[in-house]
Amino acid sequence: MSVKGDIGVIGLAVMGQNLILNMNDHGFKVVAYNRTTSKVDEFLEGAAKGTNIIGAYSLEDLANKLEKPRKVMLMVRAGEVVDHFIDALLPHLEAGDIIIDGGNSNYPDTNRRVAALREKGIRFIGTGVSGGEEGARHGPSIMPGGNEEAWQFVKPVLQAISAKTEQGEPCCDWVGKDGAGHFVKMVHNGIEYGDMQLICEAYQFLKEGVGLSDDELQATFNEWRNTELDSYLIDITADILGYKDADGSRLVDKVLDTAGQKGTGKWTGINALDFGIPLTLITESVFARCVSAFKDQRVAASKLFHKTIGKVEGDKKVWIEAVRKALLASKIISYAQGFMLIREASEHFNWNINYGNTALLWREGCIIRSRFLGNIRDAYEANPDLIFLGSDSYFKGILENAMSDWRKVVAKSIEVGIPMPCMASAITFLDGYTSARLPANLLQAQRDYFGAHTYERTDKPRGEFFHTNWTGRGGNTASTTYDV
């Protein structure tokens, strides 16, 4: 009798193929299936040639070739396609078998699938996988959540193929029940949007404002690799800025300035609004991509308003350091807001997410991997109840040290006409978050004026609510008390 597979993978696009090859490299026997079965043969005769990878030509064939409990990983497009494959798989599975969704599914879908499949005796895991094609092949960041009973069976495979920290720790651990893994992956993607936009704002300020040459820009980002900004996105930015087209000019200058998006940043912003978390920077990064898409409108508007960008005067080195500090401080705010959203969701759904472990999952293998994620892990290990990352002594010190230069950069960008929506929103958030008193007293009075929404008083206990006739005619005031 032939040896059966340890795990099956459905979907032979590049991500699926690379994960399979990664699993094979780590000694796991993988059964590969694709709806278009000719792709199975192409894979077996191509990248998988000479390996122990097994082909399957139907879902029944796939199930028959797997050890029990069967473990089947879906690497297919998120949405209805996932439900289609689940429904098609069910007749060939039995109680205790495991389905893993490794795509970018929206976490409510994962919540639904975990519950529905539990009733059928099938254990479902929704896992975020980050790192792109290279990560999938050589070690991605993996964020599993769902039915915790399944974790012991898939843990050896997923942790083996994941990226590892310098200390050898796997960038894969159990996140929480139901849709916790896909929620954390969604926030990861939102932070990715923010990081990319912040880098672009620094790039434009230095290029068009300060007037750095192409060589100076590349050198600057190369130098930043040796600072707290050290990260995958800084690395690739330095590479991009140095890449020359056939004519010797920088290719990046010929790339059309319209950015695409797949929707996960939008999901993060929508969930922030639903949970009441001020995810200002990430939401602005999504809107920045939306503005970039209005290319024709922007060109017309620039002519209509005679838009020009002013020159940033002063020592280039001084401005480069100021921008570096502003970029780092803004990045801290982005992560702080992201973890605030994760905390709120974890408490709402009772997921019990370990925030330090979440930072570890992102330390290597994924798009947002960076040096200071180790510091984030340290902060949450020192204080698991930390609400605002900027309150940690390490990050508080960076924010305070950067404050003057941060304000200078944002103010100068407004003066010369360079849009910096994310850096500006970051410092504005911090100013608001650290303000003991905000003008919301007037706002709440306005709400009470036109809608009788009531208000609390500073000279009365919290929980006692008042309504006033603000016209001065009648002078009526009502008082009620209820829990808030």
Swiss-Prot record:
<feature type="active site" description="Proton acceptor">
    <location>
        <position position="185"/>
    </location>
</feature>
<feature type="binding site">
    <location>
        <position position="453"/>
    </location>
    <ligand>
        <name>substrate</name>
    </ligand>
</feature>
<feature type="binding site">
    <location>
        <position position="104"/>
    </location>
    <ligand>
        <name>NADP(+)</name>
    </ligand>
</feature>
<feature type="binding site" description="in other chain">
    <location>
        <begin position="188"/>
        <end position="189"/>
    </location>
    <ligand>
        <name>substrate</name>
    </ligand>
</feature>
<feature type="binding site">
    <location>
        <position position="447"/>
    </location>
    <ligand>
        <name>substrate</name>
    </ligand>
</feature>
<dbReference type="InterPro" id="IPR036291">
    <property type="entry name" value="NAD(P)-bd_dom_sf"/>
</dbReference>
<protein>
    <recommendedName>
        <fullName>6-phosphogluconate dehydrogenase, decarboxylating</fullName>
        <ecNumber>1.1.1.44</ecNumber>
    </recommendedName>
</protein>
<comment type="function">
    <text>Catalyzes the oxidative decarboxylation of 6-phosphogluconate to ribulose 5-phosphate and CO(2), with concomitant reduction of NADP to NADPH.</text>
</comment>
<dbReference type="GO" id="GO:0004616">
    <property type="term" value="F:phosphogluconate dehydrogenase (decarboxylating) activity"/>
</dbReference>
<feature type="binding site">
    <location>
        <begin position="34"/>
        <end position="36"/>
    </location>
    <ligand>
        <name>NADP(+)</name>
    </ligand>
</feature>
<dbReference type="InterPro" id="IPR008927">
    <property type="entry name" value="6-PGluconate_DH-like_C_sf"/>
</dbReference>
<keyword id="KW-0560">Oxidoreductase</keyword>
<feature type="binding site">
    <location>
        <begin position="11"/>
        <end position="16"/>
    </location>
    <ligand>
        <name>NADP(+)</name>
    </ligand>
</feature>
<dbReference type="GO" id="GO:0050661">
    <property type="term" value="F:NADP binding"/>
</dbReference>
<comment type="similarity">
    <text>Belongs to the 6-phosphogluconate dehydrogenase family.</text>
</comment>
<dbReference type="GO" id="GO:0019521">
    <property type="term" value="P:D-gluconate metabolic process"/>
</dbReference>
<feature type="binding site" description="in other chain">
    <location>
        <position position="104"/>
    </location>
    <ligand>
        <name>substrate</name>
    </ligand>
</feature>
<feature type="active site" description="Proton donor">
    <location>
        <position position="192"/>
    </location>
</feature>
<dbReference type="GO" id="GO:0006098">
    <property type="term" value="P:pentose-phosphate shunt"/>
</dbReference>
<dbReference type="Pfam" id="PF00393">
    <property type="entry name" value="6PGD"/>
</dbReference>
<dbReference type="InterPro" id="IPR006183">
    <property type="entry name" value="Pgluconate_DH"/>
</dbReference>
<dbReference type="Pfam" id="PF03446">
    <property type="entry name" value="NAD_binding_2"/>
</dbReference>
<feature type="binding site" description="in other chain">
    <location>
        <position position="262"/>
    </location>
    <ligand>
        <name>substrate</name>
    </ligand>
</feature>
<feature type="binding site" description="in other chain">
    <location>
        <begin position="130"/>
        <end position="132"/>
    </location>
    <ligand>
        <name>substrate</name>
    </ligand>
</feature>
<keyword id="KW-0570">Pentose shunt</keyword>
<dbReference type="InterPro" id="IPR013328">
    <property type="entry name" value="6PGD_dom2"/>
</dbReference>
<comment type="subunit">
    <text>Homodimer.</text>
</comment>
<dbReference type="InterPro" id="IPR006184">
    <property type="entry name" value="6PGdom_BS"/>
</dbReference>
<comment type="pathway">
    <text>Carbohydrate degradation; pentose phosphate pathway; D-ribulose 5-phosphate from D-glucose 6-phosphate (oxidative stage): step 3/3.</text>
</comment>
<keyword id="KW-0311">Gluconate utilization</keyword>
<feature type="binding site" description="in other chain">
    <location>
        <position position="193"/>
    </location>
    <ligand>
        <name>substrate</name>
    </ligand>
</feature>
<dbReference type="InterPro" id="IPR006115">
    <property type="entry name" value="6PGDH_NADP-bd"/>
</dbReference>
<feature type="binding site">
    <location>
        <begin position="76"/>
        <end position="78"/>
    </location>
    <ligand>
        <name>NADP(+)</name>
    </ligand>
</feature>
<dbReference type="InterPro" id="IPR006114">
    <property type="entry name" value="6PGDH_C"/>
</dbReference>
<dbReference type="GO" id="GO:0016054">
    <property type="term" value="P:organic acid catabolic process"/>
</dbReference>
<keyword id="KW-0521">NADP</keyword>
<feature type="binding site" description="in other chain">
    <location>
        <position position="289"/>
    </location>
    <ligand>
        <name>substrate</name>
    </ligand>
</feature>
<dbReference type="InterPro" id="IPR006113">
    <property type="entry name" value="6PGDH_Gnd/GntZ"/>
</dbReference>
